[in-house]
Amino acid sequence: MLSTITSFLILLFFVTTVSAYPFEENSFPRLQDTLATGTKPGDPPKFGGGYDYVVVGGGTTGLLVASRLAKAGNSVAVIENGTYPTGNLTTVPGYNEQWFSRVLPSNWTDMVNVWPTVQQVGGGEQQHMMGRMIGGSQGFTFVDYFRTTKGAMKRWADETGDDSWTWENVQQYYKKSFKFTPPNNTARPSNATPDYESSQIVGSTPGPLELTFPKYAQAFGSWVKLGLNELKAGINRVFVEGDIKGASWILNMIDSQTGNRATTYTAFLEPTQKDDTSKIDVYVETLAERTLSNTPPGSDPVTIGVLVKRWGMRFPIFAGKEVILAGGPILTPQFLMVSGIGPQDHLQEMNITVLANRPGVGQNYNDHILFGVKHAVQVETTSVLLNDTRKWQECERFKAHANGMLADPGPDFAAFVDYPEDIRQNLSAQTKSDLSQFPSDWPDIGIVSSPLGVNGDGNHNYADLVCIPMKPISKGTIKLRSKSMDDKPVLDPQWLKSPTDMDTAVAGLQYLLRLYGTNSMKPILNASGKPIDLESSNKDDLIKYVKNNYRTLNHQSASCRMGKRDDPMAVVDSKGKVIGVDRLRIADPSAWPFLPAGFPLGTAYMFAEKIADNILSDHGSDKDEDEDELRVEL
């Protein structure tokens, strides 16, 4: 039985022992779950026009950048292949588990891009899943918020040759997007009180997007907290201060009044659309096919717009200042390559005219994997939601009080740790050498408690302990299948291809088993005391378990790596500008130099804020004098 969490993403917590609930065998929550798509009244007409900026991708970073540019007095077009989500499956935090379960929402294919990989370690294809809707993947992923480490940002600054990326210099951007509401300690149990310092979370000027803690806490997480304390994991203050080692409750992006998800769609785009002084048009159900450009004699190509396809019609949308790519680490390199920007040999193989030879496009693909160990437990988990009566009660509780099991995304307690010395001693010499290349504050693994149980057997409460190796060595590739954006690219993440990655994964699995074996966790484990599907702890069996149970965490990044302008494998410079092409920039994690320590969503917000600031510094709000001339030359 594969772990539910093993299919996807992150976190959990609380206490109280309860007996098992009478579940309905292999059923699935059915009440109050709705999902639909729609086009808003303000949607622009079928044919485009001219704007100061064109943003390709209406997800997390794209909407933030577009809104910042529009608020500064610029006209902005957002191109999104999906549409607006409606219904509560994309708003209620507790429904995110359904997107990763064996029974998906009936029309989920309208809202999600799924890309199969080539065969990976362990045999067979796996799948990447990312949002295809306004707001992107934040419509269904966990709403957890983390930052990376000081050492990771020092490495970022060193690799790009730009000290503006050091921890001290990016703090303003980490804090800029957010406002913070302290936890409701009346609603939360006393043993679920987070340790934090407000001034470390947000700045003196609050942003539009809310950070807080759910009013509900899962029972499993506080038992995990006790076990981690027994293993001397240490304590952390909500993973925002530049040193993430230790254990903590997790900050969430949640509206403290409604309990719903807080996203760039709700916090940035919607207010901007309602502001009569801002000019922002969102082209939904619109596929960006390639860039439009001119190449003046003796100069680099100049990007002047995007060719799009909407409802069967092709037309240009022009950009007087810049085109900004925010399609994510899979679509952005694909879009660059079909536009003629990428490895010359591969483009010629695809019969694409080479606009700029950038060998690094689609290379250096970074990702986190995860694997979970499931256990029957004697505390309530989301397994109880298999009972329709209980599910209805939880729905009513959420609607009335923004509380209850649906108010919590599930995983809400986590830790980042290094391997204990006795486990580290068993690593190979090559593994030890590879791990030593990372900054000292970069943890070996992340551990997440996950009480997500709807894929159980219907007879018990189930939960997972989840491990995420933090120092992957393997790097993947993205290549074109054809010259069309309609065709999915060829993905080869190369997960676990490096022997070091398998070695560290086995060490992480050993840590999970040790955590289950603590005296602190024994009171909630089932009578057998054995994890599901893991009968032996010898190394060969652990390797087999990892191969059979690992999944992507969908933390893709660095496929259009940022670097110094004289680095032949760099795709963008330290301001996100595509090297060798004018007026083209990247504002999503594909442009990161590497996948940093921790979980990346907080860093994605920081990155988008900094890129938006760079754009405004470069251009201001004045119209470019040569905008009309460039359009005539098309």
Task: Identify the role of each PLM range.
Residues 3, 7-634:
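N-terminal redox-cofactor-binding region of secreted/periplasmic oxidoreductases
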